[in-house]
């Protein structure tokens, strides 16, 4: 089974970019961009719908994280592509429990290399995401399961309960 996650991320980025330039809704913009293969794959569509929903529903919160970590930049001055790559990656970090943080960050960097207009964009995206990820981790706001991230606290509790007293 082929995975379409990179393609989906790219299509969502294109839809987010379209939203910045036109008066349309995100679902229409994104659905118009999807390939037939993605539309016919239930797992791909599940990921597409989840990521799109989380970006849309949590955009204000996500933008606050970005604004806090781009001290020298007003949100309006950040390149549209970079800003939307950050939004997409943060939606994954915060709300897609089965995607490891490193995958979300690496995908964002690779997409920045492909779509951004300067070589510095991927470094900018990496630096901002790394800082936000460290903050989220310190605050205990990263909740991953399955393949996403091992819950070390649960393992520690399990080992402690197995230790004879």
UniProtKB/Swiss-Prot annotation:
GO MF assignments: RNA binding
Keyword Thylakoid: no
GO biological process, one term: transcription antitermination
Gene Ontology cellular-component terms listed: cytosol
Keywords: RNA-binding, Transcription, Transcription antitermination, Transcription regulation
Protein's job: Involved in transcription antitermination. Required for transcription of ribosomal RNA (rRNA) genes. Binds specifically to the boxA antiterminator sequence of the ribosomal RNA (rrn) operons.
Similarity field: Belongs to the NusB family.
Name listed for the protein in its UniProt record: Transcription antitermination protein NusB
Source taxonomy: Bacteria, Pseudomonadati, Chlorobiota, Chlorobiia, Chlorobiales
């Amino acid at each position: 089974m082929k995975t379409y996650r990179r393609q989906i991320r790219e299509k969502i980025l294109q839809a987010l970019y379209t939203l910045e330039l036109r008066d349309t809704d995100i679902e229409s913009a994104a659905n118009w961009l999807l390939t037939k293969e993605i539309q016919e794959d239930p797992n791909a569509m599940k990921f597409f719908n989840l990521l799109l929903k989380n970006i849309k529903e949590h955009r204000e919160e996500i933008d606050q994280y970005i604004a806090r970590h781009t001290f020298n930049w007003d949100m309006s001055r950040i390149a549209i592509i970079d800003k939307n790559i950050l939004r997409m990656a943060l939606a994954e970090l915060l709300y897609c429990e089965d995607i490891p943080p490193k995958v979300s960050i690496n995908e964002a960097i690779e997409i920045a290399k492909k779509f951004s207009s300067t070589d510095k964009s991927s470094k900018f995206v990496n630096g901002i995401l790394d800082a936000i990820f460290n903050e989220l981790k310190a605050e205990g706001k990263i909740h991953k399961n399955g393949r996403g991230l091992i819950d070390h606290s649960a393992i520690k509790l399990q080992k402690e309960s197995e230790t004879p007293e």
